[in-house]
UniProtKB/Swiss-Prot annotation:
Binding site for GTP: Q11, E69, S138, G142, T143, G144, N204, N226
Naturally occurring in which organism (per UniProt): Trichophyton rubrum
General function of this protein: Tubulin is the major constituent of microtubules, a cylinder consisting of laterally associated linear protofilaments composed of alpha- and beta-tubulin heterodimers. Microtubules grow by the addition of GTP-tubulin dimers to the microtubule end, where a stabilizing cap forms. Below the cap, tubulin dimers are in GDP-bound state, owing to GTPase activity of alpha-tubulin.
Nucleotide-binding among keywords: yes
Annotated GO CC locations: cytoplasm; microtubule
Name the record gives this protein: Tubulin beta chain
Length: 447
């Protein structure tokens, strides 16, 4: 079987991770202690992608929980599914990273990282055929961003063939915890461009907007935001966990979604959107799901895809859905919005079906898009970074941990390059390719 080892680092990563495990344990028919109480063989068929079967029919998540202070991990273990995790897989320090990327990446985190890699190695050795890793973390803090990216690069060295997927929460100006978020995020993106294979960008601002506008929650809690994120994570991993018509593993997803290796930052969306307490009482149809899924208001990254173009996208439908209806609807959307899809990548929209819907819903759809409009998100962080870096504000927090200003400049340049690469492919057209091809032909002819 194609197993995935899951890591969650920092407070944000652990809270999202806990919500994810709660969601998929429910979908696979597991109770809070990991015993199977479900009714369908389909739930068991690919259970061991994410779970190890221990003695006495107990299933244990292949998860490694990491933090530089014990508080968030204690909260996870005291939660409803806290008994699920293997106690040896919980690794924590005492000092915390104090929202400082350098502490997570170079000092405090570096002291703890070998211990974490030992746990990861043990989990990987328990797999028959490891397909890769997924990590949940935020890019604005110290542990998730600094230590999270350190772990990614260490795992890359140790398991070069494994895929690396990250669920990364990008800081947003509306929902800001600390003043140095732009530094932490830019330094992290610099790492992710090089070391990650696929990064699902989640944005607190977009999540807040969804909660306020669509779900009509007056003051959303982090629990509500995490509920949305876990719905998307569960949707993205559906085709890995259940048998379906288009069984993508992490590598197939990357092959279908990433046309150029550096451009692996995805926008995600989910439909139908429901709040935690009110599962939808009306039946949804495939046209409605498709419409909602492509709606900019449903995207969990605060960018508008209408300001860019899709290089590739993938939709995962769950529930009793007919393949033909889905294909028709997806074709319909493409025809109506053809300006928003690049024409030089043929068949750039994939659809996958899975017959098991999420809990409490008749059917649902999850959307993953590789759109050039994601550059808005990097620009936003980059502008804030530049404004602070020009004045060298708060730099001493980082240089004090042994970092050099040069690293900041490199990270800034790398992010600017990423933005201009997205822009280049947004502007590219079929004729550009043909002209280059003709020029090459002429040159060959002249030779």
């Amino acid at each position: 079987m194609r197993e995935i080892v899951h890591l969650q680092t920092g407070q944000c990563g652990n809270q999202i991770g806990a919500a994810f495990w709660q969601t998929i344990a429910g979908e696979h028919g597991l109770d809070g202690s990991g015993h199977y109480t479900g009714s369908s063989d389909l739930q068991l068929e690919r259970m061991n992608v994410y779970f190890n079967e221990a003695s006495s029919k107990k299933y244990v998540p292949r998860a490694v929980l990491v933090d530089l202070e014990p508080a968030a991990l204690d909260a996870v273990r005291a939660g409803p599914f806290g008994q699920l995790f293997r106690p040896d897989n919980v690794v924590f320090g005492q000092s915390g990273a104090g929202n400082n990327w350098a502490k997570g990446h170079y000092t405090e985190g570096a002291n703890l990282v070998d211990q974490v890699i030992d746990v990861v190695r043990r989990e990987a050795e328990g797999c028959d055929c490891l397909q890769g890793f997924q990590i949940t973390h935020s890019l604005g803090g110290g542990t998730g961003a600094g230590m999270g990216t350190l772990l990614i690069s260490k795992i890359r060295e140790e398991f070069p063939a494994g895929m690396m997927a990250t669920f990364s929460v990008v800081p947003s100006p509306m929902v800001s915890d600390t003043v140095v978020e732009p530094y932490n995020a830019t330094l992290s993106i610099h790492q992710l461009v090089e070391h990650s294979d696929e990064t699902f960008c989640i944005d607190n601002e977009a999540l807040y907007n969804i909660c306020m506008r669509t779900l009509k929650l007056t003051n959303p809690s982090y629990g509500d935001l995490n509920h949305l994120v876990s719905a998307v994570m569960s949707g993205v991993s559906t085709s890995l966990r259940f048998p379906g018509q288009l069984n993508s593993d992490l590598r197939k997803l990357a092959v279908n979604m990433v046309p150029f290796p550096r451009l692996h930052f995805f926008m995600v969306g989910f439909a139908p959107l429901t709040s935690r307490n009110a599962y939808s009482f009306r039946a949804v149809s495939v046209p409605e799901l498709t419409q909602q899924m492509f709606d900019p208001k449903n995207m969990m990254a605060a960018t508008d895809f209408r300001s860019g173009r899709y290089l590739t996208c993938s939709a995962i439908f769950r529930g009793k859905v007919s393949m033909k209806e889905v294909e028709d609807q997806m074709r319909n959307i493409q025809n109506k919005n053809s300006a928003y899809f690049v024409e030089w990548i043929p068949n750039n929209v994939q659809t996958a079906l899975c017959s098991i819907p999420p809990r409490g819903l008749q059917m649902s759809s999850t959307f993953v898009g590789n759109s050039t409009s994601i550059q808005e998100l990097f620009k936003r962080v980059g502008d804030q970074f530049t404004a602070m870096f020009r004045k060298k504000a708060f730099l001493f927090w980082y240089t004090g941990e042994g970092m050099d200003e040069m690293e900041f400049t490199e990270a800034e340049n790398n992010m600017n390059d990423l933005v201009s690469e997205y822009q280049q492919y947004q502007d590219a057209s079929v004729s550009d390719g043909e002209e280059e091809y003709l020029e090459d032909e002429q040159l060959e002819g002249e030779e």
